[in-house]
Structures are given as C-alpha cells and as structure tokens.
Amino acid sequence: MSGVGCILGIETSCDETAVAVLNQRSVLSHEVLSQKEHSSFGGVVPEIAARAHSDFLHVLVSKAMGGAHIGFSDLSAIAVTSGPGLVGSLIVGVMLAKAIAYVAHKPIIAVNHLEAHALVARMIYADLEFPFLVLIISGGHCQFLIAHDVGRYTKLGESVDDSLGESFDKVARMLGLGYPGGPEVESCALKGDAHRFPFPRALKSRPGCNFSFSGLKTAVRYTIAKEGKLDNQALYDICASFQQCVGEILVSRIANAMAAAKSADSSISKMVVSGGVAANNFLRGSIRKCANELGFDAIFPPQELCTDNGIMVGWAGLENLRKGNFSSLELIPRARWPLCP
C-alpha cells in the first residue's frame, strides 16, 4: 500500500510503551505494552519504567510497522512524545525516534503529551472545530484550556496541588487496592454508598477554575484511620464517597470554566474531556449531565484513547504535520512542558 501521509507515533512518557501507525483516514496499527511491574509498589517507579521502555520499544515499533504493512521509507514523519513526563522514559522514545528519522531521512515531530490528549478527539469527531474547551484529567495533570488552534492554548485553571489521577492512585494505595488506582476505586464504588462519608468539596463554591484535591486525600486518610480495620462494605463506601466528591468538585469547576470560555469566545460550545481519569464511567456521566444543562456538548474520546496510547501521539503529529511544525534532531525531552507559556 502507499505510505504517503502515514505517520509513526511513539509514546513513552510514563509507564505505557505505545506505538501506532496512522494516516488521516484510519489507524493502520497500534501496539501497547502496560508495565505490570509497578503494581506491587502502588505507583510508577521511574527506573523500572525507563528500563521496560528500553527493552520493548523497538519490538513494538517493528510489530506496528509490520501490522501497517509499510516500511520506514513510506512514512511522512515520526512523531514522538517529548514531554511532559518522566525524563528517563521520554529519553528512550526520543532517542529511538531520532534514530529512525536519521536513518530513514524523515522529519521528526516533538509532540506535547498534553496536546496529544487535547487533540485526539478531533480524530474521532470530524466536526470538532477550533476553538473548544478542554479538560485534561490524568495521572500527572488536571487543567482547563481553551484550544484555539494546534499549538495555541489559553489556560483557565489547574490543580493547585495534586492531580486527580494521582489522588485516585493514592486513595487506592491507602485502601490496599491495586495499581493503577482509578479502575480499582471505580469498581469498588459501584458497590458502595456514595453518601456515607461527607468528604470536603474543596473550592466547590468559589469563583475561578482551579482545583484542589490534597484536602480530600487527607480526609480519606483520616477516615480510614478512624474506621480502623475496614470491612468490605466500608471500603466500598469510602470509594463511592470519594468518587462522588470528585464528581461534584469537577462539576462546580466545569460550570465556571464554561462561563469563562464563553466570555473569552462566545462561539465555544464544546468541551473535550480527556486523560486517563476521563475513562471513569461515573465521572463521564456526571460531566455529560452538567455540560448538557449548561448548553455545552461534552466530548469524550473512546476510553482506550483516554489512557496513554500511541494513536493520540500519531494524531497530534499529523495535526502538526499539516501545520508544517517540525523539530530538529537536536530536540531534547522535557520533564516539564506546559502548553501555555
């Protein structure tokens, strides 16, 4: 097949090793390797993550290229997550992408991991035009943005302490659940009473678009200590109450962000919600209901595209390719890379 317009996307920002080949019409192949080694530690161990990327990334690239039935010479560019993320993990992806680009004489595109989350919905929803509101809720980030165009964003608010994904992971660890914590807490919450424990809703009634989750996390810790040895029902109720609290915090902040977005540009009527936490079904329902009541369309990528993946990196690469945004082989991965200067 012709490889004109094909792009290779490489994602190694944290603990998922992911590679995809796609063009503007379809995903030709996608390979993901999740690192189970971290579960016993209750979180990601940077050294283990980097070593696993180094061991398996080249294998996934070969499988993805074979699955797409093309060679490196057929690619239009190589897109690679270059930040933000764990620098040791990022280096593995960037170095292999540089090697492929150099040997195949192809341009390289440095992809911002947050922009990849923000833009992937445009691959699924062809009618999603700029500008739109974005809520990124992931393991390392929690922020509202207005997406004006590829590479052009305005930040409306962010977490002033912990990210939402980190909070889910830490609550799961306190309760002796597995990693990643989000799916574990969500599963337990289905069997719990969401109103048993009145956890604090930080900033809920205040103006602005910032978040705070550290107080909620502390309240969960105190509740666990107060309850002593937890039976299954108490554990389920803590998970349900925590998740309910998170939903209410998000809804209150979303209302403020939508008002701020409308004030900035009255044409904005859609909000993309992405990042790993956006895969949570309860939160998706709460956010969708809130958005509908406020006259917005809440747009969620499929759940498999909310968590880290190579498809979103490849798509962000295509968006930048159309803009002529290329990087040099001297690009350096960045642990911190805000979308808004």
Swiss-Prot record:
Location(s), subcellular: Cytoplasm
Molecular-function annotations in GO: iron ion binding; N(6)-L-threonylcarbamoyladenine synthase activity
Name of one Pfam family that matches: TsaD
GO terms (BP aspect): tRNA threonylcarbamoyladenosine modification
Cofactor note: Binds 1 Fe(2+) ion per subunit.
Entry keyword Secreted: no
Top-level taxon of the source organism: Bacteria
Keywords: Acyltransferase, Cytoplasm, Iron, Metal-binding, Transferase, tRNA processing
EC number(s) per entry: 2.3.1.234
Residues binding substrate: I136, I137, S138, G139, G140, D169, G182, N280
InterPro entries from the UniProt entry: ATPase_NBD, Gcp-like_dom, KAE1/TsaD, TsaD
Catalytic reaction annotation: L-threonylcarbamoyladenylate + adenosine(37) in tRNA = N(6)-L-threonylcarbamoyladenosine(37) in tRNA + AMP + H(+)
Binding locations of Fe cation: H113, H117, D308
Cofactors demanded by this protein: Fe(2+)
Any single GO CC term annotated in Swiss-Prot or TrEMBL for this entry: cytoplasm
Family, as annotated: Belongs to the KAE1 / TsaD family.
NCBIfam families the record matches: gcp_kae1 (TIGR00329), T6A_TsaD_YgjD (TIGR03723)
Functional note: Required for the formation of a threonylcarbamoyl group on adenosine at position 37 (t(6)A37) in tRNAs that read codons beginning with adenine. Is involved in the transfer of the threonylcarbamoyl moiety of threonylcarbamoyl-AMP (TC-AMP) to the N6 group of A37, together with TsaE and TsaB. TsaD likely plays a direct catalytic role in this reaction.
Name used for this protein in its record: tRNA N6-adenosine threonylcarbamoyltransferase
Organism in which the protein naturally occurs: Anaplasma marginale (strain St. Maries)
Origin organism lineage: Bacteria, Pseudomonadati, Pseudomonadota, Alphaproteobacteria, Rickettsiales
Name of the coding gene: tsaD
